[in-house]
Amino acid sequence: GLGDTDLGKGVHIDKLVQVAHDVTVGANTAIAGCAAIGAYARIGSHCIIGGAACVAAEVHLADDIVITGMSTVNKSLSKAGVYSSGTMVSEHQRWRRNVARFCRLDDYMMRLTRLEKECSKAHE
């Protein structure tokens, strides 16, 4: 069945926020307008969920986490800090290609750095 949603002391929830069933929100957390929290999510204390952000069902967020506006959180986060996601609107096919490339961007940069070092040594 549906369980209770538990809001800790000092929680601030803005207008047009959707909070599903069986959600726990820790003390002194703020959730900005148009955000959505999925069922069974656990939000820690002293967190900030930005406007139009989405926390997927069953995701757990540690204490002291900031989710910037319009971000989608699809996995649990155990380390305090600021997290962002999202891209600007574009045609769907282009967006799909760019997201795939973006996910490999760090690997590309490490490879490029390694190749630059190899080229520098070859020209010495």
Which ranges hold each PLM region?
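Long, leucine- and charge-enriched amphipathic alpha-helices
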Residues: 89-124
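Structural signal for interior beta-strand "rungs" in well-ordered beta-sheet cores
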Residues: 1-91
